[in-house]
Design a protein with these regions (language model features):
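S1/OB-fold single-stranded RNA-binding interface
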Residues: 2-33, 38-39, 63
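Beta-strand secondary-structure signal
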Residues: 3, 49-51
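Short beta-strand micro-motifs enriched in acidic
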Residues: 9, 51-55
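Non-catalytic, surface-exposed connector residues within folded enzymatic/regulatory domains
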Residues: 28, 42, 55-58
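Alpha-helix boundary/capping detector
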Residues: 30-32, 42-44, 68
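Short nucleic-acid-contacting surface segments enriched for D/E, G, S/T with interspersed K/R
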Residues: 36-49
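OB-fold/S1-family single-stranded nucleic acid-binding modules
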Residues: 54-69
């Protein structure tokens, strides 16, 4: 698993971006990839662990686990 910080996440749109630790690239995250009970959302600057894949549209998270704040 990789670690990173949420750059931003829109509840209305259901997606946002994560910045992996030590990198300047962004990883797209959709709410369906968030592993948590209840409402699946993330907060700006929240720490997460995640897995990601490369697609034709860029990097996207496939599994996101929010860390305690």
């Amino acid at each position: 698993m990789n670690s990173g910080t949420v750059k931003w996440f829109s509840d209305a749109k259901g997606y946002g971006f994560i910045i992996p630790d030590g990198q300047d690239r962004e990883v797209f995250v959709h709410f369906r990839s968030i592993e948590m009970p209840g409402r699946k959302t993330l907060q700006t600057n929240q720490r997460v662990e995640f897995e990601f894949e490369q697609s034709e549209r860029g990097l996207h998270a496939t599994r996101v686990v929010p860390l305690p704040m």
